[in-house]
């Protein structure tokens, strides 16, 4: 059936990403010289340590995809001169490769971009791979050797992982709290069916960054008020969306991804599973007098209750329908990740990590917004992915709320 050796069939939670040919990319902005040969050697070592990423996907007769080993060597590092006026987008093809690495050379910064198929890795997984790549690169530059290589098995599907942890699917999903909204309001029609493309295209993204001081102030505000940083950020996003939607009487459905690795016992390694991610839900009923601390506290309380009930753990067993946007009859969803903090990454002494961002690539149009939040180099970054109107207006409103909160609540930093 397949010309190469089949590693395994994709699980249900992974298949949705194959059908949309979805890749996620992380880009590290580095200042300082980059040795191309050393980066290429580090990438080769990374693929030897994680050989599944040297494979590709093939569609079976039933329409489902399989991970199939490649008979040929991986194409390796792609080097682009970013000083040229135009550069073509990297060609992503799941039938050829599940991991591409691109080095873009610039005047003041160089960009190291890792593209990984979403069927095999979520953001946490990809971040770990990029960290390992740069660590091995540092070893090659400083010692001439990329370090020990112990090949890892293919990561487990979330379904298998959760089954081994005793997690079972229940009848409840968390979306029940949105049912009172179903066809309850006069809402504009949802966009027509999403356009499909032959090959993955980069999804539009708009971004804002707080300064390191603004980020530190916000962290202090959250801690001093007994709130999680994630909840404060979620409350700011909800308040900004509520103000700009101009439908003050309509509650807002909020959905956010939850990394289950540290919520399971025993904890799950960064590269042990493909997408061990649950989905938490919250129904925001906001008015002119809604206080950000009260809203954030209610988000935390709802999350803890759903976590205690096992709702969030078992949500990873369900379909990726949320990737297709808001169902008919409901107000537009807000989709968001929890904040991920990039740990210090090893680099040679003359190389400095100065920025970090992500991008989604898939073979369909994304006519809804998806927030991705992270802290790197001590600065909060908020990305808004999707083909939506006025994304910068939303991000500016969120930033204004986040930057004004510490002073409004009495936290002044010198």
Curated annotation (Swiss-Prot):
Keywords: Acyltransferase, Lipid biosynthesis, Lipid metabolism, Transferase. It holds the Pfam family PapA_C. It catalyses: 2 a mycocerosyl-[mycocerosic acid synthase] + a phthiocerol = a dimycocerosyl phthiocerol + 2 holo-[mycocerosic acid synthase]; 2 a mycocerosyl-[mycocerosic acid synthase] + a phthiodiolone = a dimycocerosyl phthiodiolone + 2 holo-[mycocerosic acid synthase]; 2 a mycocerosyl-[mycocerosic acid synthase] + a phenolphthiocerol = a dimycocerosyl phenolphthiocerol + 2 holo-[mycocerosic acid synthase]. GO terms for biological process: lipid metabolic process. The record marks 304 as: Important for mas ACP domain recognition. GO terms for molecular function: acyltransferase activity. Gene3D superfamilies: Chloramphenicol acetyltransferase-like domain (3.30.559.10), Nonribosomal peptide synthetase, condensation domain (3.30.559.30). It is an enzyme of class 2 (transferase). Coiled coil: none annotated. Its EC number is 2.3.1.282. The record marks 122 as: Structural role in the organization of the active site. The active site is at residue 118. Monomer. Interacts directly with the acyl carrier protein (ACP) domain of the mycocerosic acid synthase (mas) protein. Consists of two structural domains that are related to each other. Catalyzes diesterification of phthiocerol, phthiodiolone, and phenolphthiocerol with mycocerosic acids, the final step in the phthiocerol, phthiodiolone and phenolphthiocerol dimycocerosate esters (PDIM) synthesis. Can directly transfer the mycocerosate bound to the mycocerosic acid synthase (mas) onto the substrate alcohols. Belongs to the acyltransferase PapA5 family. This is Phthiocerol/phthiodiolone dimycocerosyl transferase.
